[in-house]
Amino acid sequence: MPDYWIANDPGVVSGLMVWDGKNSWAQEGLAYEMVRLVESELAAASQWQDWNLHVIVEGVTLPRMSHSPAKDGFGQIESIGTLCYLAQKYGAELLPQDPSMRKGITLAMLQKIGWYYPSPDKHMVDSAKHLVVALLRKRILRIEELI
């Protein structure tokens, strides 16, 4: 079965990167729009073909004893929770990532493989970086292809 990858960089404005093994696209928008888009992608992919579905989400760490919302309210946490639910609903592998994991992936690396998608808030770039990290960890992509 082929792989279908969806990476999300959550926030009030979120980034989304989708790759089916050959073609890729990215989009940036409000969190609820991106969550809805992830659901439609997972639903379509599960109906059109037998895909191995993968959902990559950037995790969030809450400070201990924090009773106040993060700078974006609770939107980021709600998005991550909804994406976790959608991954389970559609039988996708959930791959949470610490935000720091994408730090070693440069814009030059993304440009080399054709995954540099400029956006005002850089969320599409961040979601592409998360996808690269996941593919490196799964050994689908090799670091030599990026440098």
Describe each region flagged by the PLM:
Residues M1-I147:
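Phosphate- and other anionic-substrate recognition elements at nucleic-acid/protein interfaces
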